[in-house]
A protein has these predicted regions:
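Metal- and O2-centered redox machinery and metal/ROS homeostasis
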Residues: 1-148
Length: 148
């Protein structure tokens, strides 16, 4: 889906034109580092992105729709989850699966620490994109999905 959006915004040469930002490179570096050294911590990144995109991402989709006003069906595929019919039920089941994983206290604490770091990396990307407005939106949606 992301490649369709990039193709819409940048055209057929999107791979040459769309270069990752410093924040994106930092995030990718961390994901690769975790994958190599502590792969179970990838769960924290998956949780942060997937739950975030399913929850606050839908809010951001509406904001992007209004701000960018792309033609219907263009430029916002990133926020579509066609295989998930009921996002609330899916999130509940996903959290139940995570709660059922057999991690010791040290691993649980490491996952929480990594999820918080993943959140900060996401905020760094938002800062690059939109400055303080992006950071505020990200905080609102993070607090919404975590119940804080």
């Amino acid at each position: 889906f992301l490649s369709r959006d990039l193709r819409y915004y940048y055209g057929p040469m999107w791979r040459e034109l769309a270069k990752p930002s410093e924040a994106c490179n930092t995030y990718c570096y961390r994901i690769n580092e975790v994958a190599e050294n502590d792969p179970y911590l990838l769960i924290a990144h998956h949780y942060t992105r997937y739950i975030g995109d399913l929850s606050g991402g839908q809010i951001l989709k509406g904001i992007a729709q209004k701000a960018l006003n792309p033609p219907v069906g263009e430029g916002l595929h990133f926020y579509d989850f066609p295989r998930i019919e009921d996002s609330k039920a899916w999130k509940t089941e996903y959290r139940a699966v995570l709660d059922g994983l057999n991690f010791d206290e040290q691993q649980k604490n490491a996952l929480i620490t990594e999820a918080n770091y993943a959140f900060r990396l996401n905020m760094y990307m938002f800062d690059e994109i939109q400055g303080d407005a992006g950071k505020s939106l990200w905080k609102i949606f993070w607090n919404t999905i975590t119940g804080k």
